[in-house]
Amino acid sequence: MLSANNYLNLTTHPKVVEAMIEATRTYGAGSGSVRAIAGAMDLHLQAEQKVAEFKGVESSLIYSAGYTANVGLIPTLVKGKEDVIISD
């Protein structure tokens, strides 16, 4: 079963459908694996650049899930026994 969130009902919007068709023509039906294994696609880098521009910062990094963000960031940020991270 395939599923996705559709909060804004964009899955059937004509512009979204056309962009999906074009992306499928260009990139195929999937990346083949997660970014950590298959590497970054130009779409990843473009999305991160757009987020950075929107936030007015030099760069950004998009994680695919909260868990991967925690695994990637917490060991970098937390160095001492006195540090505490609370994550939902």
Residue ranges and their predicted role:
Residues I74-D88:
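Conserved PLP-anchoring active-site segment centered on the Schiff-base-forming lysine
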